Amino acid sequence: MAESSSNPTRINILGKDNIIIDHGIWLNFVAQDLLQNIKSSTYILITDTNLYATYVPSFQSVFEKAAPQDVRLLTYAIPPGEYSKGRDTKAEIEDWMLSHQCTRDTVIIALGGGVIGDMIGYVAATFMRGVRFVQVPTTLLAMVDSSIGGKTAIDVPMGKNLIGAFWQPERIYIDLTFLNTLPVREFINGMAEVIKTAAIWDESEFTTLEENAKAILEAVRSKNKSADRLAPIRDILKRIVLGSARVKAEVVSSDEREGGLRNLLNFGHSIGHAYEAILTPQVLHGEAVAIGMVKEAELARFLGVLKPSAVARLTKCIASYDLPTSLQDKRIVKLTAGKECPVDVLLQKMAVDKKNEGRKKKIVLLSAIGKTYEPKASVVEDRAIRIVLTPCIRVHAGVPKDLKVSVTPPGSKSISNRALTLAALGEGTTRIYNLLHSDDTQVMLNAVAQLQGASFSWEDSDVLVVKGNGGRLQATSTPLYLGNAGTASRFLTSVVALCNPTDVNSTVLTGNARMKQRPIGALVDALRANGVGVKYLEKEHSLPVQVDAAGGLAGGVMELAATISSQYVSSLLMAAPYAREPVTLRLVGGKPISQPYIDMTIAMMASFGVQVQRSAEDPNTYHIPQGTYKNPETYIVESDASSATYPLAVAAITGTTCTVPNIGSKSLQGDARFAIEVLRPMGCTVEQTDASTTVTGPPVGTLKAIPHVDMEPMTDAFLTASVLAAVASGTTQITGIANQRVKECNRIKAMKDELAKFGVTCNELEDGIEVTGIPYTELKNPTEGIYCYDDHRVAMSFGVLSTISPHPVLILERECTGKTWPGWWDTMSNYFKSHLEGEEEPHSSHVSHEKPRKGNPKSIFIIGMRGAGKSTAGKWMSEVLNRPLIDLDHELERREGQTIPEIIRSERGWEGFRKAELDLLEDVIKNNPTGHIFSCGGGIVESEAARKLLISYSQNGGIVLLVHRDTDQVVEYLMRDKTRPAYSENIREVYYRRKPWFEECSNFRYYSPHPDGSKALTEPPFDFSQFLSVICGHSNHLEEAKKKPQSSFVSLTVPNVSKALDIIPKVVVGSDAVELRVDLLEDYDPEFVAKQVALLRSAARIPIVYTVRTVSQGGKFPDDDYALALKLYRTGLQAGVEYLDLEMTMPDEVIEAVTNEKGYTHIIASHHDPKATLSWKNGGWIQYYNKALQHGDVVKLVGVARELSDNFALARFKASLAAAHDKPFIGLNMGTAGKLSRVLNGFLTPVSHPALPSKAAPGQLSAAEIRQALALIGELEPRSFYLFGKPISASRSPALHNALFRDNGLPHQYSLFETDNAADVKELIRATDFGGASVTIPLKLDIMPLLDEVSDAAKVIGAVNTIIPVGSGDKVTLRGDNTDWMGMVYALRNAGVVKVSKESPAAGMVVGSGGTTRAAVYALHDLGFAPIYVVARNADRIKALAESFPADYDIRSLSTPEEVAAESTAQPSVVISTIPADKPIEQSMREVLVASLRHPSVTNGKHVLLEMAYTPRHTPLMQLAEDAHWQTIPGLEVLAAQGWYQFQLWTGITPIYTDAQAAVMGN
């Protein structure tokens, strides 16, 4: 550590020079000063475990050399983080001190950040009624804030710092060298307190902070690994820390015990602490205070004591240090997993603030930068606080009569953005007055600074001083993020073309989701035509774009379509003087839109020294000379004329008077005409001078409609006109506003939809809107609130209408007005005296606009080698997703009217074929973007252009699926297949050449584990359906697992899945998912791993947890092979695994890549501590929890238990976090002592199985063992299950279910309850321990009225054989179902019967007409059989049966052999017998059956008879079928299968079928 070269600086506090500050004072100075001036027999150095090794041993060495022999230095370390700052740790330290015989002369040294300082200070304050201590802050936050002033405290469940004492340190040693090792986020965190101090006390210090933000951040973020990485800002650093510490010392000296003045140091903390209380520990103190400062400044602005410009300046300064300024900041959302901060909870947290007086909340209000409104915190009512904390605002009518106000709107956004652009491109310094302080201009300021185009500073809080660099801009590697700032995006697209290359040759402009929909195509076309390279990175014709650093336009003649936006024209005009030759700009395509804005740009360019000549011959042509803008000394920005329409409209609608003092007839802005051309014809009195406009409205309710008004010169003002027209008498027609469809939203549609909520009818016109007014007293209540589409003008317009609505109006998205008038709602409150209330967003609000549908509706493109199975996969996909399948080869032939071989043989050749193939691909991507499946030809990837299309499609949310199977199988198949054109080269060579192309084009890969010709290929196999459900976003496994009290996944520890296929079905029983330990596989080749996933999915039939466990985390994968790890993670994502375990020790770039590409796969963010370095008893795990919370859908933390109590510590840790976050959490301890943690974990517990070769982790239990343990400790209550019916004494059901309960570790019991009266079971099925029941004859129908709901199948069948209690506690619902038909289907499928396809129809037959017959008919229909023949004695019963089913079941009676012969084309291939087997078959039925079983058409294919009777086991009908060479299935198979399904419905566990079968058969 560097040492101080001169005497350190001292700061006086409370009359003593006790604050000592400099670089490098820790080692020599501190030890000597302590020993000389703060003498003691015992010094105790307390720090945290992160700092101990770095700073304690070296200090010990120095101290012990200098100390007398009778002086001792003890050291103690606690875990880092806020979690340690509590009663437990304090007690632990005190007990340790007592055990070391520490007495009242002890001096404690608190080395660390705020947590150490606060808590150790409180230990000092209370140990033996107070001992001396010194502060050695190591973080910036502690240096400037918590270490100074003697406030000490611990946290308690009710809040932070609520128990503590004032106890002044004897010394505060601030060694700035500590900051060299401070992590970037911690340094930035501390800057919040530095900004705070300057904001309340010293504007000159605040200006220093503004000017040095770039330099400070560059040094802090530098990759320089040297010990003195902050050397470039050494002097700045000392100045800002010294300045901040001095202010705090001065305030504390004046008011040590917080009588009033010291409250000022709490600026930003009242609201900030409330946020922190909810969001800790994921959000740091400084981050919460940064947001709190912005909110408290907005509060001061709302109360009318702080200028909007000061709020904007404070916000910009905070943002310039990369601190968050709102809860919507992407980093905050990510860090907290989107946790909400409800306003009522925030106000509750604020109610326990120490500054408050009783129930009155006190908040520090700024009156200017560097100055507070009062020399103490001010009392503020909850209503005002609620307004700034909530996203929505409710506006009540009630503007006072006879009101006369003067309102100055913010500077024009249009003029502000142009002024900033011109000043940044100009030479010299200019002062810009009345600049709009808004999101849009902030974006522009940030972007220009990033391009090094100009430097900015503030004077008198609201004058911006711009020093331009004369157009010398530098390309930047960091994308310019423009939010939804449309004006900035258009101006900057041309401006960045002026950049010179740096270490990068281009600049990327991007924005939010809405910005990525807004058009910019015409401007890009013009730039490209002039030689500037511009590339769309996502959607064509919209941001993001990558613009080459061209050093300026080429110049000459440029053409631009100007019918969509005049901003394109202004953008080129302003950049044109820096072209390499003079520019002639021609506007083509029709009359330019918004000509006044073009005129505004030209007039402003003249103010900055460049004269544009409009052509005399063609008014749409402009000549721009070469030159450099010369910045004027001052430039005054007019108020925004579009914004001025709102206060003027309030006067118009409420019959009051409003003056806008700085917009008149000589305005540059077209919207200045609004008062004369719209308000006057509507009945208002308008007085307009050159520079001001005054409007007085007619009596309320007497506005007149305007039959027609062309608002083309003032398009943005049409929204204001529309809300006035809504309450005017008659119909108003507004035209000339077509461009308003492509603004922040489609404003014409927005107006129509939102006015409809008030009961106002509008019609959309081609270029406008028609509004039919109604009396204002008849306006309806828009109960859901007004949705603003993130559009400032929509919000402000409806604010105007709300002032006379008979119902208070809720406006959603209050803050979107920040784009042009951040203080609009303050203006309504302070000037128009509107009563406003802040509200949370209602849950139902505008769901249709915002909430994405579950799943991905985009079309799917299938690629892959010829013969890989694309057509088959396409058919399966079409069936599963119910989407049309289009084979692009067939479609190409259809469109061309030629076969592909004919096209290739024609003069067009291969090149012509590939061109046609590419054109077709482009067409379907453009015209069929959703709801389709396209199977591409194998050679589509041969074309680079086609590859680019597919890559772009997959990167923009589309699915490009690569289908593949074993390469040898594909080659062998193609060698056999003579129906396709032959390859001109070796098949294998073709595949290996195309393989990298297939991989780069696809974002998902299906590796088929099914051998060619397997029975699975006749219908979609389970593994394929499961894969599809994940990649299309239809899987809800995580949601289902969260609802279960217990869930688990079994860890598969095999080197090759193909060698374990026989045991996999057994080991997955009772688990909700199966973990593939990729690190334990014998080969890490991605193709081998993909095959393992495919085989496992097919064999296990449950979701997959895909894990690559590194050596340091307890696995086998190399710790530092990050490239291969990322490749394997991507293999898992492309294979559509349900869960992917992502270790939080991976580098950030790996974590970011995986989380960005995860699609619908759920990330299990994990950290394992096999060496037991962390403890659940303190905050050691918190940093890993925070990181996992940020990146995972599930958090998984695994420690080691050395003793039983470690499991209870883990349980407490989990409980404390569960209260704050509902993210699923797997928390375990490894080792024998940790078994209890596995039993208690609950959610997705990793389990083993006795059949596996080894356990994946020490202490792992099987799922059955966990259930047994839960039963023993009372967490899994025994349930009673029954069979109801009569006679039932011979039933095999008890044997079946009790065996399965036993095998799966369940404590339940299944018993017989014999009765033929449903009333007898009424109380039994409502008992608290009732688990479920089987129902047999004669109660299958009688039981139904006793149930709460019945499944659709049971309704159609008309019988219930299973009762399932759903829910728990008081909310149990009894559901009836029927598993008889499921058992029949399973038994038939087991025998090889497959679902009937439409292409190959087949008939089925049922014998009998009793109760079970209905289930048999349902089963055959489910399998696709039609017609379904019924053979029975009673023709009337057959007729009644047929009529009771829907017509598409096609039920037909067969009563004679002749009828069998007549049905020769559709003889049954499956027969289900439901007649008793203990009596002979009735003769006429026997004849029909013999004729059918022995019909000549049944000699081919599979023919199966399923016998439902099971006594005797081999029935006469089975013999009859076997004699005719039919395959037969005995009735006990169905009994086993239906009971097997019942068990699944009751327990959620799917046992192995053969176990159920063995129990039934008595094996």
Curated annotation (Swiss-Prot):
Residue segments, region 3-dehydroquinase: 1052-1265
InterPro entries: 3-dehydroquinate_DH_AS (IPR018508), Aldolase_TIM (IPR013785), Aminoacid_DH-like_N_sf (IPR046346), DHQ_synth_AroB (IPR016037), DHQS/DOIS_N (IPR030960), DHQS_C (IPR056179), DHquinase_I (IPR001381), Enolpyruvate_Tfrase_dom (IPR001986)
Bias (Basic and acidic residues): 836-850
Cellular localisation: Cytoplasm
One CC-aspect GO term: cytoplasm
Cofactor note: Binds 2 Zn(2+) ions per subunit.
Pathway assigned in UniProt: Metabolic intermediate biosynthesis; chorismate biosynthesis; chorismate from D-erythrose 4-phosphate and phosphoenolpyruvate: step 2/7; Metabolic intermediate biosynthesis; chorismate biosynthesis; chorismate from D-erythrose 4-phosphate and phosphoenolpyruvate: step 3/7; Metabolic intermediate biosynthesis; chorismate biosynthesis; chorismate from D-erythrose 4-phosphate and phosphoenolpyruvate: step 4/7; Metabolic intermediate biosynthesis; chorismate biosynthesis; chorismate from D-erythrose 4-phosphate and phosphoenolpyruvate: step 5/7
Annotated binding of 7-phospho-2-dehydro-3-deoxy-D-arabino-heptonate, by residue: 129, 145, 151, 161, 193-196, 248, 262-266, 269, 285, 354
Residues covered by region (EPSP synthase): 395-834
Residue numbers binding ATP: G864, M865, R866, G867, A868, G869, K870, S871
GO BP annotation list: amino acid biosynthetic process; aromatic amino acid family biosynthetic process; chorismate biosynthetic process
Keywords of this entry: Amino-acid biosynthesis, Aromatic amino acid biosynthesis, ATP-binding, Cytoplasm, Kinase, Lyase, Metal-binding, Multifunctional enzyme, NADP, Nucleotide-binding, Oxidoreductase, Transferase, Zinc
Transmembrane segments: none
Chain positions recorded as Zn(2+) binding sites: E193, H269, H285
Stretch list, region Disordered: 836-857
Catalytic reactions on record: 7-phospho-2-dehydro-3-deoxy-D-arabino-heptonate = 3-dehydroquinate + phosphate; 3-dehydroquinate = 3-dehydroshikimate + H2O; shikimate + NADP(+) = 3-dehydroshikimate + NADPH + H(+); shikimate + ATP = 3-phosphoshikimate + ADP + H(+)
GO molecular function annotation: 3-dehydroquinate dehydratase activity; 3-dehydroquinate synthase activity; 3-phosphoshikimate 1-carboxyvinyltransferase activity; ATP binding; metal ion binding; shikimate 3-dehydrogenase (NADP+) activity; shikimate kinase activity
Region entry Shikimate dehydrogenase, spans: 1278-1563
Classification via Pfam families: DHQ_synthase, DHQS_C, DHquinase_I, EPSP_synthase, Shikimate_dh_N, SKI
Residue sites binding NAD(+) per the record: 48-50, 82-85, 113-115, 118, 138-139, 160, 178-181, 189
Entry's family note: In the N-terminal section; belongs to the sugar phosphate cyclases superfamily. Dehydroquinate synthase family. In the 2nd section; belongs to the EPSP synthase family.
Quaternary structure note: Homodimer.
Function text: The AROM polypeptide catalyzes 5 consecutive enzymatic reactions in prechorismate polyaromatic amino acid biosynthesis.
Name of this protein: Pentafunctional AROM polypeptide
Originating species: Sordaria macrospora (strain ATCC MYA-333 / DSM 997 / K(L3346) / K-hell)
